[in-house]
Amino acid sequence: MGKKVAIIGAGISGLASIRSCLEEGLEPTCFEMSDDIGGLWKFSDHAEEGRASIYQSVFTNSSKEMMCFPDFPFPDDFPNFMHNSKLQEYITTFAREKNLLKYIQFKTLVSSIKKHPDFSVTGQWYVSTERNGKKETAVFDAVMICSGHHVYPNLPKDSFPGLKHFKGKSFHSREYKEPGIFKGKRVLVIGLGNSGCDIATELSHTAEQVVISSRSGSWVMSRVWDDGYPWDMLYVTRFQTFLKNNLPTAISDWWYVKQMNAKFKHENYSLMPLNGTLRKEPVFNDDLPARILCGTVSIKPNVKEFTETSAIFEDGTVFEAIDSVIFATGYGYAYPFLDDSIIKSENNKVTLFKGIFPPQLEKPTMAVIGLVQSLGAAIPTTDLQARWAAQVIKGTCTLPPVKDMMNDIHEKMGTKLKWFGKSETIQTDYINYMDELASFIGVKLNIPWLFLTDPRLALEVFFGPCSPYQFRLVGPGKWPGARQAILTQWDRSLKPMKTRAVGHLQKPALFSPWLKLLAIAVLLIAAVLVF
């Protein structure tokens, strides 16, 4: 009999965790408070307490070849960026194909998780649940928390003087579902993140006027990148990471700002971030620049104070006759079923080794899956996190001593503050992070060796998209179809757009031949030195 593992939540993190437990011979039981899988991506026409909530028009920001489970590509005919309903269809198909649904207890609320009295010896947990008014408590050998970080809204109303006197409506963006009720209205959106920009641009087609208030600005990227290819298939590459890690900071920063300004000059649109060299996650929105050009959306600084009908901004300008204020101000991280001392979260800092393991526990039998954010997609990240966590729970992998884990956390926090700023402490660099996790479970690629043994594949792996298939190409959990999936990823990306015969599919020339030759030479020298 394998160890019994409680999994909290049946979104993408929960499904990845169930599958990883099964791969390691563990016995998972997943508790899901709703009646379906999907978590964040399961749309509901009203916001539900304790659950993530999305608006009806949400599309993915990662393209299909970059966001799939590593051994389960999206169907060829699925669009590159898909509506939430399409992604939910994929998630459901994955769960059924992998036979995961039978391990899920739906409509079950986890009310508390507490250490067993002999935790220091066994590492076991008491998990208490409620279903249809019935309460139960069971003992589990480990717990994987997969409840996400889009559940508990950050609603800083106390930070806005005069808001309590405002006579219009004010609410968090999680309550927003569709634009119909805002026709002809004047709307202020506070926050320049993905949700704020999506909502503002959608409302701009029906509302009288929309204003976005932002404290610090943001880079705004289009899903459509150079020559019309999906942004992440060109931007999230090992070659880009190689350059970022090895170029002098001044050159790297200059190149980053140049890339961000490639489509339009952010200064001209009042969008320029205060610290443009920080690698904070940019906003993904294809419509915002056009809506600003058309005058239906405008960008303003932080709100200084509210009156009964207006907002006064820090630059002294006023937005008058406001009907609604929507706070797109993000979410906090909370685990109400868990003692606060286990996972400390203050000032946006979560104390977790590699964003997964509470370092102070006597036994490494608790893991948080899916909390980390990066420019990479969530699904492959959670898949790799869950694989490592399952092996740690099983005992195949071990964690470093507490002192070493704490030192690593503090060191990484310093790096995160440098690269992403104080407000982005769960952010991380995608490829570096994924390679680090991959090394723990023996699935990290040896790129120089790959150039010597399979140069065709190596070129695609290094210069092409860092797609999820790379993390099931070798080692434990290897997928036999990974190599072919990598070599055909551009075909699947281009196929749904090939709806009229106009010639052959045009794959991108990823980098100039001279740059390729230089990089290959460096890698081959490294391979010779190593072997």
UniProtKB/Swiss-Prot annotation:
It is a single-pass membrane protein. GO terms for cellular component: endoplasmic reticulum membrane. One of its GO terms (biological process) is taurine biosynthetic process. Keywords: Endoplasmic reticulum, FAD, Flavoprotein, Membrane, Microsome, Monooxygenase, NADP, Oxidoreductase, Transmembrane, Transmembrane helix. The chain crosses the membrane at residues 511-531. Its cofactor is FAD. NADP(+) binds at T60, N61, S195, G196, C197, D198. Liver. InterPro entries: FAD/NAD-bd_sf, Flavin_mOase, Flavin_mOase-like, Flavin_mOase_3, FMO-like. FAD binds at G9, A10, G11, I12, S13, E32, L40, W41, N61, S62. Pfam families: FMO-like. This is Flavin-containing monooxygenase 3. It comes from Oryctolagus cuniculus (Rabbit). The lineage of its organism: Eukaryota, Metazoa, Chordata, Craniata, Vertebrata.
